[in-house]
């Protein structure tokens, strides 16, 4: 798979796990009352945008025949992110004052735990997809045929 376009898939593959890890850290800060909910809520949308860009660009760059596993992982990641967003909004609304009174306390605790677990799944899927992209995506500069005097070996080093 040739990595064309801007931003490149390889750069998104490096950036996305970091963005998700920052989001998880902000969520942990809110959970343990070190931060307010605003940093976690505010960073959720840029993090989601970066994740969806990675998944959508991977879907468009990966051919169905050669890279079916990348396409499946991208679709799974997009699905998980949408579920995580819905869980996050409902968990946020459950903590509002007055709280959601139609849900029992145990259901709210289960909702927050599900949001936390889905966040861990999003991080795991992001790392796995990023690793696959870094393994499969070839930068444009390396995909062009080398001249007779130049040979490329390994990860972009000249022989």
Put a short name on every predicted segment.
Residues 1-159:
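Polytopic transmembrane helical bundles with strong interfacial aromatic enrichment
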């Amino acid at each position: 798979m040739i990595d064309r376009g801007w931003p490149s898939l390889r750069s998104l593959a490096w950036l996305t796990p970091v963005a998700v890890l920052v989001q998880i850290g902000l969520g942990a800060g809110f959970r343990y009352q070190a931060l307010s909910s605003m940093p976690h809520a505010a960073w959720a949308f840029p993090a989601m945008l970066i994740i969806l860009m990675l998944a959508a660009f991977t879907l468009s760059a990966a051919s169905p025949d050669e890279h079916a596993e990348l396409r499946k992982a991208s679709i799974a990641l997009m699905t998980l992110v949408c579920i995580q967003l819905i869980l996050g909004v409902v968990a946020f609304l459950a903590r509002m004052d007055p709280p959601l009174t139609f849900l029992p306390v145990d259901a709210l605790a289960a909702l927050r735990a599900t949001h936390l677990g889905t966040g861990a799944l999003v991080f795991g899927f992001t790392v796995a997809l990023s690793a696959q992209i870094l393994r499969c995506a070839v930068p444009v500069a390396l995909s062009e045929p080398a001249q007779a005097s130049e040979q490329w070996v390994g990860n972009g080093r000249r022989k």
